[in-house]
């Protein structure tokens, strides 16, 4: 994958997250902000989830209260380089815990 392909895929990931949050109908408020390629989800309790792109490594990084995760693209899916879990699974787990209610991005 070259840099432009990586940015296209990361942009698509960011857009999907934004669209899902725009349609969010849960009780808790989740704010989404993008600044310089970093996507920040802010929760009512003051906690945050930070998602950023690591262009030199062609990875997406996810920082949550539970820890940090690095994702590589494998077969059109962002997969954690340590656990093998998908980006969406780990994001939903963290967002659900930090929001205090079930959050789905799919």
Curated annotation (Swiss-Prot):
One of its GO terms (molecular function) is ferrous iron binding. It comes from Salmonella newport (strain SL254). It comes from the Bacteria. Keywords: Iron, Metal-binding. SUPFAM superfamilies: Frataxin/Nqo15-like. Belongs to the frataxin family. InterPro entries: CyaY, Frataxin/CyaY, Frataxin/CyaY_sf, Frataxin_CS. GO terms for cellular component: cytosol. The keyword Endoplasmic reticulum does not apply. The keyword Iron applies. Involved in iron-sulfur (Fe-S) cluster assembly. May act as a regulator of Fe-S biogenesis. This is Iron-sulfur cluster assembly protein CyaY. NCBIfam families: FeS_CyaY (TIGR03421). One of its GO terms (biological process) is iron-sulfur cluster assembly. PROSITE patterns: FRATAXIN_1, FRATAXIN_2. Transmembrane segments: none annotated. SMART domains: Frataxin_Cyay.
């Amino acid at each position: 994958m070259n840099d432009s392909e990586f940015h296209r895929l990361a942009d698509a990931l960011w857009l999907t997250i934004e669209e899902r949050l725009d349609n969010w109908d849960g009780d808790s408020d989740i704010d989404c902000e993008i600044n310089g390629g970093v996507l920040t989800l802010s929760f009512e309790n003051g906690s945050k989830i930070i998602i950023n792109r690591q262009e030199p490594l062609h990875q997406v990084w996810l920082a949550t209260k539970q820890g940090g995760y690095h994702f590589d693209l494998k077969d059109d899916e962002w997969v954690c380089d340590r656990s093998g879990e998908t980006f969406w699974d780990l994001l939903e787990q963290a967002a659900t815990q930090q929001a205090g209610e079930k959050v789905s991005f799919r």
